[in-house]
Regions:
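Soluble periplasmic/extracytoplasmic beta-strand elements of cell-envelope proteins
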Residues: 43-46, 77-80, 173-175
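Short pre-active-site segment immediately N-terminal to redox-active cysteine/selenocysteine motifs
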Residues: 43, 48-54, 170
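Structural alpha/beta surface segment adjacent to cysteine/selenocysteine redox centers
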Residues: 48-50, 56-134, 138
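Bacterial N-terminal signal peptides that target proteins for export
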Residues: 1-10
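C-terminal cap of thioredoxin/glutaredoxin-like
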Residues: 49, 130-202
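Short secondary-structure boundary/capping segments
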Residues: 34-36, 68, 165
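A short beta-strand-turn-helix
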Residues: 27-42
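Bacterial N-terminal signal peptides
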Residues: 10-21
Length: 202
């Protein structure tokens, strides 16, 4: 997806969302979702979409080792940034952002690992509801979230801000120390090689 197409997509997605019958929420906050040592020398931001198969692949095959070898070792601080690339992904991101932030990583991990069951089903919203119930979300709350204009607007605003800074053109994209940008579901060895190429790891 090119940058121009992505910018157009963001505008179209915003119009689609605004066209829904929304009920407004009050004083919604989107706290950063970060794992790892506060003062870790390497800060990695991941931009991901919950309906993106490449994102699901990264979180299944690469992230566990990144967590074990880099994050838990104090070398990396890792931030998760919602970057939904379609309406269904926006719904899923809104679900993840509507539970306590300390459960966000567990929730998105479950959504990504079960992506084929809900995102590519004949009735994805119903399947998303089934998964949401595992997080303690009732059907009533689920419907409220899917009609929460303010929450979705804040997610969109964050997307626009990050895209203007780093020209995010696909998911997953990783920004390292606000300087280096890499894209794709890299294998762990490829991921580490990039960090070494940037002279961030020995």
């Amino acid at each position: 997806m090119t940058i121009k197409i992505l910018n157009t997509f963001i505008l179209i997605l915003a119009k689609l969302l605004i066209g829904l019958n929304f009920s407004f929420a009050n004083d919604i906050k989107l706290p950063p979702i970060v794992v790892g040592e506060k003062n870790a020398p390497i800060v990695i931001k991941e931009y991901f979409s919950l309906t993106c198969s490449h994102c699901a692949s990264f979180h299944k095959n690469t992230y566990p080792k990144v967590k074990k070898e880099l994050i838990d070792a104090g070398k990396v601080k890792f931030e998760f940034i919602d970057y939904p690339l379609d309406r269904l992904a926006m719904f899923a991101a809104s679900i993840a952002r509507s539970i306590p932030s300390e459960s966000y990583v567990e929730t998105t991990s479950l959504l990504l690992s079960n992506q084929k069951k809900w995102a590519y089903s004949k009735d994805p919203v119903t399947e998303l509801l089934k998964l949401s119930k595992l997080f303690g979300i009732t059907e009533k709350k689920f419907n409220e979230i899917l009609n929460n204009k303010e929450l979705m607007e804040k997610i969109l605003k964050k997307m626009e801000e990050e895209n203007s800074r780093f020209n995010i053109s696909s998911t997953p994209t990783f920004v390292i120390n606000d300087k280096h940008v890499i894209s794709g579901a890299l294998k762990y060895n490829e991921f580490v090689k990039k960090l070494k190429d940037f002279e961030l790891l020995n």
